[in-house]
């Protein structure tokens, strides 16, 4: 163990690729142990020397191998390659040559400049010392697989079909291969020449957009913190980022690869997928003249005002656009308390036609539809096409001046008002049906009640101010017609007109004015009207008494007739018994008895006592 205390000699570093087993033999053997061999995998690469300088051009070995393909001595080529790579570590266990370089030397050393795959294997085992002991099947699987991969992936090798049947193909050197570092070929599944072309065009377009976006978009200064490029922060064709919108400097972009930069919020349009609409990139900068803007504003304002005026006018007037009937009810008519006369009675006088409607002065703008001075129709906007309310003739029902106008006049008026809005009529069909139902109900109520018949002959003027005090002279009534109407109902209707009710109700009786003397007093008119009403009531009572008497007489006659019928029945029974008692008599006697039986007896026979 004393030998371990001695200093170990400094072993020289090997730069020419010598094996470590050669260096181990120089170790001192004083320690009493023999040198041990070490596996080849642990012998390389050798450590670099301290004064090692990395060569500038690393392609010298490849260039030398490609330029010396024609030389027939492979050993000289290998020495030249080793000399070019002096003072550098070995790349592989056999030296600085790659598998592609070894295959190139093997094919170039052949006479026909072509070798099969098995011949390349043999050349490797024979000429490269590293593969001499690796020719068996167990240890050659790895490096033979590497040779096959290099043959298929490098452009410098070309496969040629063998003429003989059942033989492997030839491998030759491609004369069109570029000198220098060879480019690896892609597999057949990755042959995407079309994709490469499209990607090249996309790159050019990205560069153009990048330059145009940086220069033209409002001269915006790009953020210095962008990792890919400043121009990609702008999206000139995006509708969300018009005007040169710039992303926040805190936005972290992805790596600057083609896939990643095109995949995130890509401003690049897909090629041949979107139609070209002809819009320029800076279409957002297009402006409109001031005159065009004013015309558009005026057009929009006039349309809005017209629609608003039409809707307001229809709502104020109570019209429905579809039916032309008023949607709001007329002002309610509230007459004083009145009793209703039986249906079918009308008191007519010879002078009722003298009550004519007085013309209204032109200064008062009374609404013809609602008969009101403060109607909302007068405060609305002017009627379309210069139509005035006076030019529309409406026919009111004389029985109720404040009621709704007739359907013909309202349709005429609504058609003129709704000349420009006929398209909106279909939206109000439901309102039309509701108004038609209401109109039918009102007509039925007016026709079924006594007011609808008695008030048809009234004046179309307001009847709120109609009073007995305004009339002078006597009141006349056609009593005969009244009595005839009573007799038509066989006396089943009763007339009961209280005096107080007649004095307060003037809507159910048609009054006439036979005097034009306006200077007479109200007291005289009231007294004369009261006298005539008393006479009318007395006549009606007399008529009722006469009817009662007639009814009593008819009742008595009916009683007499019933008594006579009873007597006749008794006589018939006695005749039948008499006939049964004389059945043994002759046929003539039977005939006499049968002849004595009357079929219809109106009076007792003379022989019955």
Curated annotation (Swiss-Prot):
Annotated positions of the Phosphothreonine modification: 43
Functional note: Transcription factor involved in the regulation of the insulin signaling pathway. Consistently activates both the downstream target Thor\d4EBP and the feedback control target InR. Involved in negative regulation of the cell cycle, modulating cell growth and proliferation. In response to cellular stresses, such as nutrient deprivation or increased levels of reactive oxygen species, foxo is activated and inhibits growth through the action of target genes such as Thor.
Gene3D superfamilies per the UniProt record, alphabetical: Winged helix-like DNA-binding domain superfamily/Winged helix DNA-binding domain
Coarse class of the protein's main subcellular location: cytoplasm
GO terms for cellular component: cytoplasm; nucleus
Organism: Drosophila virilis
GO process terms (BP): cell differentiation; glucose homeostasis; negative regulation of cell growth; negative regulation of cell population proliferation; negative regulation of insulin receptor signaling pathway; regulation of DNA-templated transcription; regulation of lipid metabolic process
Residue ranges of DNA binding: 94-200
The name this protein goes by in its record: Forkhead box protein O
Signal peptide extent: none
CDD domains named among the record's database cross-references: FH_FOXO
GO molecular function: DNA-binding transcription factor activity; DNA-binding transcription factor activity, RNA polymerase II-specific; RNA polymerase II cis-regulatory region sequence-specific DNA binding
Extent of Polar residues compositional bias: 62-79, 220-229, 254-263, 388-397
Assembly, per entry: Interacts with melt.
Compositional bias segments (type: Pro residues): 327-339
Localisation per UniProt entry: Cytoplasm; Nucleus
Chain segments carrying region Disordered: 1-89, 181-263, 321-365, 384-411
């Amino acid at each position: 163990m004393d030998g371990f205390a001695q200093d170990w000699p400094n072993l020289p570093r090997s730069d020419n690729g010598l094996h470590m087993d050669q260096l181990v033999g120089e170790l001192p053997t004083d320690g009493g142990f023999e040198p041990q061999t070490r596996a080849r995998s642990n012998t390389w690469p050798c450590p670099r020397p301290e004064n090692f300088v990395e060569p500038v051009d690393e392609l010298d070995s490849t260039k030398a191998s490609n330029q010396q393909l024609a030389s027939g001595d492979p050993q000289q080529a290998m020495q030249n390659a080793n000399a070019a790579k002096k003072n550098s570590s070995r790349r592989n266990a056999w030296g600085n040559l790659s598998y592609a370089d070894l295959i190139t030397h093997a094919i170039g050393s052949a006479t026909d400049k072509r070798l099969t795959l098995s011949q390349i294997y043999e050349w490797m085992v024979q000429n490269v010392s590293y593969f001499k002991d690796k020719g068996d099947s167990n240890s050659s699987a790895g490096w033979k697989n590497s040779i096959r991969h290099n043959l298929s992936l490098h452009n410098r090798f070309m496969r040629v079909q063998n003429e003989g049947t059942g033989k492997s193909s030839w491998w030759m050197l491609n004369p069109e291969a570029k000198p220098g570092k060879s480019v690896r070929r892609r597999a057949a599944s990755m042959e995407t020449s079309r994709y490469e072309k499209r990607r090249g065009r996309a790159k050019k377009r990205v560069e153009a957009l990048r330059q145009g976006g940086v220069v033209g978009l409002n001269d915006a200064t790009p953020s210095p913190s962008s990792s890919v490029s400043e121009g990609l922060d702008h999206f000139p064709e995006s509708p969300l980022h018009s005007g040169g919108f710039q992303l926040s400097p805190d936005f972290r972009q992805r790596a600057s690869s083609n896939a990643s930069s095109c995949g995130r919020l890509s401003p690049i349009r897909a090629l041949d997928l979107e139609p070209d609409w002809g819009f320029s990139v800076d279409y957002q900068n297009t402006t409109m003249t001031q005159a065009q803007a004013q015309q558009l504003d005026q057009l929009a304002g006039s349309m809005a005002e017209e629609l608003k005026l039409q809707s307001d006018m229809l709502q104020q007037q109570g019209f429905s656009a579809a039916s032309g009937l008023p949607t709001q009810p007329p002002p309610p008519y509230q007459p004083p308390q009145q009793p209703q006369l039986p249906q079918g009675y009308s008191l007519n006088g010879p002078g009722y036609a003298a009550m004519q409607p007085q013309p209204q002065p032109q200064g008062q703008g009374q609404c013809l539809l609602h008969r009101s001075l403060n109607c909302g129709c007068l405060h609305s906007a002017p009627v379309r096409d210069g139509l005035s309310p006076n030019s529309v003739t409406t026919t009111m029902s004389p029985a109720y001046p404040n009621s709704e106008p007739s359907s013909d006049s309202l349709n005429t008026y609504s058609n003129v008002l709704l000349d420009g809005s006929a398209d909106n009529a279909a939206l109000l069909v439901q309102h039309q049906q509701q108004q038609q139902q209401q109109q039918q109900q009102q007509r039925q109520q007016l026709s079924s009640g006594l007011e609808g018949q008695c008030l048809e002959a009234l004046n179309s003027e307001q009847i709120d101010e109609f009073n007995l005090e305004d009339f002078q002279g006597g009141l006349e009534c056609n009593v005969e017609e009244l009595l005839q109407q009573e007799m038509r109902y066989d006396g089943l209707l009763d007339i009961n007109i209280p005096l107080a009710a007649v004095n307060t109700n003037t809507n159910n009786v048609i009054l006439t004015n036979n005097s034009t003397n306006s200077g007479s007093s109200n007291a005289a008119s009231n007294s004369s009207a009261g006298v005539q009403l008393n006479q009318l009531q007395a006549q009606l009572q007399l008529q009722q008494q006469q009817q009662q008497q007639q009814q009593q007489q008819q009742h008595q006659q009916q009683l007499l007739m019933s008594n006579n019928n009873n007597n006749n029945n008794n006589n018939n029974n006695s005749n039948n018994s008499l006939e049964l008692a004389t059945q043994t008599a002759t046929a003539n006697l039977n005939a006499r008895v049968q002849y004595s039986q009357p079929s219809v007896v109106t009076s007792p026979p003379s022989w019955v006592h």
